[in-house]
From Swiss-Prot:
Known role: Involved in the synthesis of the major structural component of photosynthetic membranes.
Membrane-spanning parts: none
Gene3D superfamilies, per the entry: Glycogen Phosphorylase B
Protein family membership: Belongs to the glycosyltransferase 28 family.
Pfam families per the UniProt record, alphabetical: Glyco_tran_28_C, MGDG_synth
Name of this chain's protein: Probable monogalactosyldiacylglycerol synthase, chloroplastic
Source organism: Glycine max (Soybean)
EC numbers, comma separated: 2.4.1.46
Gene: MGD A
Top-level lineage group: Eukaryota
Length: 530
């Protein structure tokens, strides 16, 4: 593990090389820290005017092995934060983004009320004026996401498609990666950092669980906001949104703080659409949202414990692409279109958008288990989705299989692939689970990401719509039994999956949003032209 981290050519190593170019003469970096984990800890009071705020960030936890190198990198970044804040005091202080103090009531009626960002990023005090006219132009929806895993973008695109399908040109919907598109380096490297951390499980677990305590992630956002508030404000305001939808746990805190300081919380509908089915990072929940759309009752209970009111919470399900709601073609027709055998039962083997996981080993095991040596014929077939992994697709296509096997790359009509099959093997991604339930597919989970996907395993297993195993041989045995002596179990799990399915979730979400924005009598007027 240590060698893997030391040899990884990643954004984090690039981060170290950049921050070491700074000249420091007063801040000491130690290997032994006493705080909880690798979080940014904000310390110091916000001051405006000539007295600039001094802030620092700390890396906590006593770590060893591969994590020591990771810790040293963030220690160097810690020094960069202190240096940058002392020399270039920008961000919340210069934007006058307060926390509701100094007479503020949380809606901009206090210090910081009425500020705006001009095209050059400067601050003006003319405020955001309601135009006094009912909305005649298309209303604008801004969806905040990040490409940290495929599920956030998939949910964003599903919501966008549902708005267009239900309301046509009445809404203009924009999808933006807030961190990648509207924050400076190194914060715009978030997707790359996530990919690195997920590949190294212990580092990801340290990050996920270490930032879970409220005191930790609030300090993190406070320090981070020092650098990104100006850019984020410009990014938000240039879209002039009537509705802002966050489909990512890191897209609530800084935008909401900016909107509150500008007095826009009652003018712009800000909502969160949670894309995790069970285990949720606490950063998903913020008390200032207009709505928090939860996919399950378990997530709704977590929202209540986080301090949200019942009136803020709606349990509609996980938004999936509207195409999954359309009538399903018969299996034999779909199989014929996909080049599959029309009569044999089929298993769908997926590895996500990047074709990750033990796909080849599982496919080979299935090839053996689905061939009956006694009759010399296959008892099932395999549809493999390799995503963008062309090397894997080519390798699987070159194998001389004993059973019918169809190998696909990146597909856009997943509803057809699922509709052609009788069960699915996949990692515990929430979007794939929700889509499989809509199609009534029993699910075999073969892996999960620690933290946000860990709860999806008991969600599937305990609700009787699937099983979990990391062993390719055990998985192949389960499928062979489902296609043979345990066909009754396959049928029961299919019914359980359909019972949990919420195919209309995305439509309920957009209609509720439409009603919320309709209740707003005035539309805000913006001045940022950046």
């Amino acid at each position: 593990m240590n060698n893997g981290v030391s040899q990884e050519s990643s954004v984090l190593l690039d981060l170290a090389s950049h921050v070491n170019r700074f000249a420091f003469d007063s801040f000491r970096s130690d290997n032994n820290k006493t705080l909880l984990s690798n979080f940014l800890h904000f310390n110091g009071n916000t001051r405006t005017g000539a007295a600039a705020a001094k802030r620092g960030v700390s890396l906590g936890g006593k770590v060893g092995g591969a994590s020591v190198r990771f810790g040293n990198i963030l220690n160097d970044f810690n020094r960069a934060v202190r240096f940058h804040c002392e020399k270039i005091p920008i961000g919340f202080a210069s934007l006058r983004v307060g926390d509701g103090g100094d007479g503020a009531d949380g809606n901009g009626n206090g210090e910081g009320n009425g500020v705006r960002v001009d095209e050059c990023g400067g601050v003006e005090n003319e405020g955001f004026r309601g135009n006094g006219v009912e909305g005649e132009k298309p209303k604008k929806v801004l969806i905040l996401m990040s490409d940290t895993g495929g599920g956030h973008r998939a949910s964003a695109e599903a919501i966008k498609a549902a708005f267009y399908q239900e309301f046509g040109d009445d809404y203009q919907v924009f999808v933006t990666d807030l961190w990648a598109d509207h924050t400076p380096w190194p914060f715009n490297q978030l997707p790359r950092s996530y990919s690195f951390l997920v590949k190294h499980g212990p580092l990801w677990k340290m990050t996920y669980y270490g930032t879970a305590p409220r005191v930790v992630h609030q300090s993190n956002f406070a320090a981070t906001g020092t650098f990104i508030a100006r850019e984020v404000a410009k990014g938000l305001m240039k879209y002039q949104p009537d509705i802002i939808i966050s489909v990512h746990p890191l897209m609530q805190h800084v935008p909401l703080r900016i909107l509150r300081s500008k007095g826009l919380l009652k003018k712009i509908v800000f909502t969160t659409v949670i894309t995790d089915l069970s285990t949720c990072h606490p950063t998903w929940f913020h008390k200032l949202v207009t709505r928090c759309y939860c996919p399950t009752t378990d997530v709704a209970q977590r929202a209540l414990k986080a301090g949200l009111q019942q009136s803020q919470i709606k349990i509609f399900g996980l938004p999936v692409r509207p195409s999954f709601v359309k009538p399903v073609q018969p299996k034999d027709e779909l199989r014929r279109e996909l080049g599959m055998d029309e009569d044999l039962p089929a298993v769908l083997l997926m590895g996500g958008g990047e074709g990750m996981g033990p796909i080849e080993a599982t496919a080979r095991a299935l090839g053996d288990s689905l061939y009956d040596e006694n009759i010399g014929a296959p008892v099932g077939q395999i549809l493999v989705i390799c995503g963008r992994n062309k090397k894997l697709a080519n390798k699987l296509s070159s194998i001389n299989w004993k059973v019918p096997v169809q190998v696909k790359g990146f597909v856009t009509k997943m509803e057809e692939c699922m509709g052609a099959c009788d069960c699915i093997i996949t990692k515990a991604g929430p979007g794939t689970i929700a889509e499989a339930q809509i199609r009534g597919l029993p699910i075999i989970l073969n892996d999960y990401i620690a933290g946000q996907e860990a709860g999806n395993v008991p969600y599937v297993v305990e609700n009787g719509c699937g099983k979990f195993s990391k062993s390719p041989k055990d998985i192949a045995k389960i499928v062979a039994e489902w296609f043979g002596p345990k066909a009754y179990e396959l049928q029961q799990m299919s019914q359980n999956a359909l019972r949990l399915a919420r195919p209309d979730a995305v439509f309920k979400i957009v209609h509720d949003l439409h009603e919320l924005v309709r209740q707003r009598s005035y539309l805000p007027e913006y001045s940022c032209t950046a």
